[in-house]
Structure formats: C-alpha cells, structure tokens
C-alpha cells in the first residue's frame, strides 16, 4: 500500500514539473505569441502563459507586439512549459537572461494578467503578476492609459 502511494505521488510530481526548450525567437506574432527555433531547427509556436495581450486590431495590439519584439526578437530564450493549448501551441513562461518576459509584458502595460489561468501559476507568480498589473494600471502604463480598456477575452467573443 505504501509503495503504491509513493508511486502515485511521484507520478503527480512528474505531471507538475515543467519541461524546458531553448532556442532563438524567429517570429513575434502578437503580444503573447512567438515562434522559437530550437537547435534541431524545429520551430515551436509558443503562447506566453499567464497573460493575455490585446488582439492586433484592438487598441494597443500593435504596440504590445512591438514591445514583445523589442524584448525578445532574434534572442536566445528558454521556455518553461507544461502543456499545449487547443491550437497546438506550447504554453509557457519565456525567459531571456533569466528574466520573465511574460511578466515584463504585464509590467509594461502591454498585457493583462490572465486570471482565468491563475491556477496554472505558483502562488508566488500569481502575486507577482497581480502586483505588476496593478502597478501598470496605477501608473497608467500602456493600455492602462485608457480608463477602462477592453480585455481581449471579451473582444474575441464579439
């Protein structure tokens, strides 16, 4: 019985662990989606976890994409990922020189913290992302210059 319990717990730990991929950013599609080319010359479409950036036709959509491009285009990145979304994209946290690019998009006011997927984040990351969004809102950075910016999850339902 104990052995079974230990085996079950070990398998759960394995599920929760993130996989990692590294490569160079070869495309920035919008403020929360990129393509990474790994050392085997395989392209991976990456959806930045924990954030939702304005759609391209929304206010700040092109600025969000440009900000992300400035941060990571043609740079070496590491992606810590745990799953694929329904579109086949790898969902993960993108790191450049150890810095969380997803968080930087929120901090710059170029994306919302995506509360719908907060359960996928650690408690520490939830606090960081929430604080970054609140700080950007208070400072009226990026999309927060508008009093009530329309979030992309509502815009997509139109």
Short names for language-model regions:
Residues 2-5, 10-158:
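Small beta-barrel nucleic-acid-binding modules, primarily SNase/OB-fold domains
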């Amino acid at each position: 019985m104990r052995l079974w319990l230990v085996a079950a717990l070990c398998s759960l730990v394995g599920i929760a662990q993130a996989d990692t991929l590294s490569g160079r950013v070869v495309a920035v599609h919008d403020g929360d989606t990129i393509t990474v080319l790994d050392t085997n010359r395989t392209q991976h479409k990456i959806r930045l976890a924990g954030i939702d950036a304005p759609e391209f036709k929304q206010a700040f959509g092109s600025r969000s994409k440009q900000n992300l491009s400035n941060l990571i285009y043609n740079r070496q990145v590491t992606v810590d990922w745990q799953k694929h979304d329904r579109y086949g994209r790898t969902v993960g946290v993108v790191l450049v020189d150890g810095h969380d690019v997803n968080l930087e998009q929120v901090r710059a006011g170029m994306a919302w913290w995506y509360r719908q997927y907060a359960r996928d984040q650690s408690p520490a990351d939830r606090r960081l992302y929430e604080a970054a969004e609140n700080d950007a809102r208070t400072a009226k950075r990026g999309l927060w210059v508008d009093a009530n910016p329309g979030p992309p999850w509502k815009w997509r339902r139109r």
